[in-house]
UniProtKB/Swiss-Prot annotation:
InterPro entries: Aa-tRNA-synt_II, aa-tRNA-synth_II, aa-tRNA-synth_II/BPL/LPL, Lys-tRNA-ligase_II, Lys-tRNA-ligase_II_N, Lys-tRNA-synth_II_C, NA-bd_OB-fold, NA-bd_OB_tRNA. It comes from Chlamydia trachomatis serovar L2b (strain UCH-1/proctitis). The keyword Metal-binding applies. This is Lysine--tRNA ligase. One of its GO terms (biological process) is lysyl-tRNA aminoacylation.
């Protein structure tokens, strides 16, 4: 029983493999080992911007600068004794000109029976990767061009490029075949180059604030730091059950105990839960913790960090347009300070409900009549849980401008200090929202080991009553570390994928992940 791989039967693949054989028969290696001492195309474009560089006649006389570079052939047209192509390298393109009497093919023997220009026209295809040496000139229309002296085939492409105008129209194919998507779409390349720059800017800012970047384990014996379902695996060497981390928090707090006063980590986190427009089971976070801070200090850090990134990406501007809200395009200003309000205030302002004027049964009635939540989610909920549900249902998607929503109910987290005012029903937690989505979660971190144990044990009791709940097991090593003594601290976590979505005008988290999780396609079998 053989497995059919569709592209192997495609006419274009068969045609290109026949060319591959012909190229080898000519004594040319279509997959050489290296091609060094190259400039990048963007470097060439940056260095040579003066259109008085010289015309093609000067290039033919070899009087203009000579360059050596490599890239993928993405356009080609033959015009008599000349042929023109376009080379793509990273996100930059440059025009090249091949000439019947000037251009040579590396490795092509003089008695091969085919001229260099015919080899270029007949044996090369769009998608091939080429090394090129030649002389720069400007065309009459001002186009920077390279008159190619020598072309070296570096990789023969056996699959045709996506249509240059339509690109990959099917989104699922784009996500599955990201390599082709990157080749065909300038916008997609720009998105991922911006993602890379955002990561660089985050590190730049955190380093400026004297944070130390660290690495902590992805495989853990106890998972914690968030309410989420973990991925479970087995470590064969120890015959032990292990978990992929659902958060970076616990390990970073242990480093605070060890005397590292400001730490952060950028890394992958895994949650075995749903997939939708803003959620992927594998995602990237930054978590950071600073000794002697509280959540007020963290608020300033978060909004200044995001403003720093936005200004760097937008030539000093703080406004960003986002096009994918149901209400239509919105312009968001990330300039600090952001709007701050308590969770109760936000429910009053955006949901029209003053929770302090309503008893628990009245809050349940509001959830019943104004939301589509199933009754089981709120029928036995505590008052704090009811308030959190009202916020989720009535407020979140209305927070378009950047907001810090502060002072959450105690029930929402066991890892945070209660309000210093003495109200033990609320905690010093804030979540940052923008464009209707959560961007950041942050606390004045709980460092009282006895109170921490009490809250975690309360979670375990709730788990015993509801086996389907997401409450995580107690990490005794973490509690031992707290007993050693953790300084007062503030900490935050930001979902980097979601931040990139907001800053690149992406409709889906899949648009900012090179390889998002996709349903497996079963291969066709005979």
């Amino acid at each position: 029983m053989s497995v059919e791989v569709e592209y192997l039967q495609h006419e274009d693949y068969l045609y290109r493999t026949s060319k591959l054989k012909e190229i080898r028969d000519l004594g040319i290696n279509p997959y050489p080992y290296q091609y060094t001492d190259c400039l990048e195309v963007q470097e060439i474009r940056n260095q040579f911007v003066d259109n008085e560089l010289g015309d093609s006649e000067a290039a033919f006389r070899k009087e203009t600068p000579k360059v050596r570079f490599a890239g993928r052939l993405v356009l080609f047209r033959s015009m008599g004794k000349n042929a023109f192509g376009q080379i793509l390298d990273n996100d930059a393109k440059i025009q090249v000109m091949f000439n019947r009497d000037f251009s040579a093919v590396a490795g092509l023997a003089a008695d091969a029976g085919i001229s260099p220009i015919k080899f270029i026209e007949k044996k090369l295809d769009l998608g091939d990767i080429l090394g090129l040496e030649g002389y720069l000139f400007f065309t009459h229309s001002g186009e920077l061009t390279v008159l190619v002296e020598t072309v070296t085939l570096l990789c023969k492409s056996l699959i045709s490029l996506p249509d240059k105008h339509a690109g990959l129209a099917d989104k699922e194919i784009r996500y599955r075949k990201r390599w082709a998507d990157l080749i065909s779409s300038e916008d997609v390349r720009k998105t991922f180059l911006t993602r890379s720059r955002i990561l660089k800017l985050i590190r730049e800012y955190m380093d400026q604030q004297s944070f130390l970047e660290v690495e902590t384990p992805i495989l853990q014996t106890v998972y914690g730091g968030a309410e989420a379902t973990p991925f479970v695996t087995t470590l064969q060497a120890l015959h032990a059950e292990m978990f992929l981390r659902i958060s970076l928090e616990i390990a970073l707090k242990k480093l605070l105990v060890g005397g590292m006063s400001r730490v952060y980590e950028i890394g992958k986190v895994f949650r075995n839960e749903g997939i939708d427009r803003t959620h992927n089971p594998e995602f990237t976070m930054i978590e950071a913790y600073a000794a002697y801070w509280d959540y007020n200090d963290v608020m300033k850090c978060v909004e200044n960090l995001v403003e720093y990134i936005v200004r760097a990406l937008n030539n000093g501007e703080t406004q960003v347009q986002y096009s994918h809200l149901k209400s239509g395009p919105q312009v968001v200003d990330f300039k600090a300070p952001w709007i701050r309000m308590t969770m109760k205030e936000s429910i009053s302002v955006y949901g029209g409900v003053d929770v302090d004027l309503h008893a628990d049964h009245e809050l349940r009635k509001i959830l019943e009549t104004q939301t589509s939540l199933p009754e089981k989610t709120y029928v036995h909920a505590s008052r704090g849980e009811l308030i959190a549900l009202l916020f989720d249902e009535l407020v979140c998607d209305k927070l378009i401008a950047p907001h810090h929503i502060t002072d959450h109910p105690l029930e929402t987290t066991p890892l945070c200090k209660t309000l210093r005012s003495g109200d033990e029903t609320l905690v010093e937690r804030f979540e940052s929202f923008c464009l209707g989505k959560e961007l950041c979660n942050a606390y004045s971190e709980l460092n009282d080991p006895l109170q921490q144990r009490k809250l975690l044990e309360e979670q375990m009791r709730k788990k015993a009553l509801n086996p389907d709940s997401e409450y995580h097991p107690i990490d005794e090593e973490f509690l031992e570390a707290l007993c050693q003594g953790m300084p007062p601290a503030g900490g935050f976590g930001i979902g980097i994928d979601r931040l990139v979505m907001m800053l690149t005008d992406a409709a889906s988290i899949r648009d900012v992940l090179f390889f998002p999780v996709m349903r497996r396609i079963e291969a066709k079998k005979d």
